């Protein structure tokens, strides 16, 4: 395999290459994806199972044209925590089902109305910073997960973090041949070894993981429904819809295709929400397309849905193989943080590419103001509370950008703008 060769979305991959490429994607999403069930105090096996099923459904519904891995959604954490505290986890599952169903209805509406409106509500001057914020607002998360800030900083965590990051960075630039397609996987392995040598990972933890029961059945649960619990979770639909559009835009920019048109936003949005609905029915957490895996594609230039599908199959297998799932859970924060540090930055850069590729003219006040306000809104920490749902970061910035874009569009229609 030639260095830096692009492996396209529909391209077949040899079995001997498919496995390590798929493992790389699974590891990239693992740290963030299992964090959600840990917060909800539930076994992550069911989440690994549904992540795999959801990803395969996504590939099937989008006709294999949109490479995306579905992991656990963070957007539901705040309202779901409230519901779990007051009603129990099964009622949160009911909320997940309803949000997923409403998202499927929204996808049908988009199918009937088209996507031309996106260029009006999110012109390039707004779209670029919104996409960039998907990665930039997670920068702090990468640092905290990597244990390089706060009270968790030790010599071992810093060394492990730096080894992981350094291998990922220099490997992406220097590796040739097949190794140029798996720098993230190699970085994770090197970081793990560094973690063992520095004491970040205790050898007893590894031994305990290897002695876990070989066959482990995920804990399936059924949802219960309460109108009050549903109303607390339902507003998250606004958040995940914006998040989904942003992810499709940045993925399209990475692979060089317009995914909003082919396979279409209606298909990808339906697939995303259908997976969330199924997750609620079997006891898992909601799913969403993952920025970490977009970052992996941006670095490796491997876009094949067969690789993504392989990662999904591996995730399903891991959910039933106790020692394998337990070993993956021993990957420490500094390793996940070191990888995320680079991946989130790559997503941010993809947003800036939108501005460059669309030749956004910043001599026009409208474009300058749009980009400026969106960036500041997303990075300032401003929060808008709507009942039990809080809008902040990229989501709030996207909404502000949409409103401003519509206002500026009206100014143009009535010839009120001073931009020539």
Residues covered by each model-derived region:
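Intrinsically disordered, low-complexity non-transmembrane regions of multi-pass membrane transporters
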Residues: 1-20, 203-219, 253-260, 268, ...
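Juxtamembrane interface elements at the cytosolic ends of transmembrane helices
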Residues: 2, 31-33, 164-171, 182, ...
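Membrane-embedded helical hairpins/re-entrant loop segments and their flanking transmembrane helices
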Residues: 5-16, 38-59, 65, 235-305
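Hydrophobic, membrane-embedded alpha-helices of multi-pass small-molecule transporters
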Residues: 16-29, 154-165, 182-183, 198, ...
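Transmembrane helix-boundary motif of multi-pass solute transporters/channels
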Residues: 21-54, 66-91
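C-terminal ends of transmembrane helices
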Residues: 54-66, 104-118, 168-176, 245-256, ...
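Interfacial segments of multi-pass membrane proteins
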Residues: 79-88, 172, 293-308, 314-318
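Membrane-embedded alpha-helical modules
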Residues: 86-202, 312, 317-419
């Amino acid at each position: 395999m030639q260095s830096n060769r692009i492996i396209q979305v529909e391209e077949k991959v040899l079995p001997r290459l498919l496995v390590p490429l798929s493992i790389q994607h699974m590891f990239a999403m693992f740290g963030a994806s299992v964090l959600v069930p840990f917060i909800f105090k539930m076994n992550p096996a069911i989440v690994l199972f549904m992540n795999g099923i959801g990803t395969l459904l996504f590939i099937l519904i989008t006709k294999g044209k949109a490479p995306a891995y579905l992991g656990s959604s963070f957007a539901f954490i705040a309202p779901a925590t409230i519901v779990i505290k007051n009603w129990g986890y099964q009622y949160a599952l009911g909320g997940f089902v309803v949000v997923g169903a409403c998202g499927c209805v929204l996808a049908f509406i988009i199918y009937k109305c088209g996507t031309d409106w996106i260029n009006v509500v999110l012109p390039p001057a707004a779209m670029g910073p919104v996409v960039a914020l998907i990665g930039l607002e997670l920068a702090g998360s990468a640092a905290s997960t990597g244990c390089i800030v706060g009270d968790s900083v030790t010599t071992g965590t810093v060394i492990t973090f730096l080894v992981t990051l350094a291998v990922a960075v220099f490997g992406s630039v220097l590796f040739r041949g097949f190794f140029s397609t798996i720098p993230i996987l190699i970085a994770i392995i090197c970081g793990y070894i560094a973690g063992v040598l520095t004491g970040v990972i205790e050898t007893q933890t590894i031994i305990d993981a290897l002695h876990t029961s070989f066959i482990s059945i995920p804990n399936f649960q059924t949802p219960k429904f309460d109108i009050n619990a549903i109303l607390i979770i339902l507003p998250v639909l606004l958040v995940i819809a914006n998040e989904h559009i942003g992810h499709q835009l940045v993925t399209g920019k990475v692979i060089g295709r317009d995914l909003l048109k082919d396979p279409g936003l209606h298909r990808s949005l339906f697939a995303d929400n259908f997976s969330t609905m199924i997750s609620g029915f079997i006891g898992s957490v909601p799913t969403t397309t993952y920025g970490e895996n977009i970052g992996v594609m941006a670095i490796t230039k491997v876009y094949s849905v067969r690789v993504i599908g392989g990662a999904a199959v591996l995730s399903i297998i891991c959910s039933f193989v106790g020692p394998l799932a337990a070993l993956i859970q021993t990957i420490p924060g500094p390793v996940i943080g070191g990888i995320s540090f680079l991946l989130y930055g790559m997503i941010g850069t993809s947003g800036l590419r939108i501005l460059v590729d669309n030749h956004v003219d910043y001599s026009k006040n409208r474009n300058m103001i749009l980009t400026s306000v969106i960036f500041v809104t997303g990075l300032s920490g401003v929060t808008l509370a709507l009942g039990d749902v809080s809008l902040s970061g990229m989501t709030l910035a996207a909404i502000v950008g949409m409103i401003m874009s519509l206002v500026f569009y009206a100014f143009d229609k009535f010839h009120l703008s001073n931009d020539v």
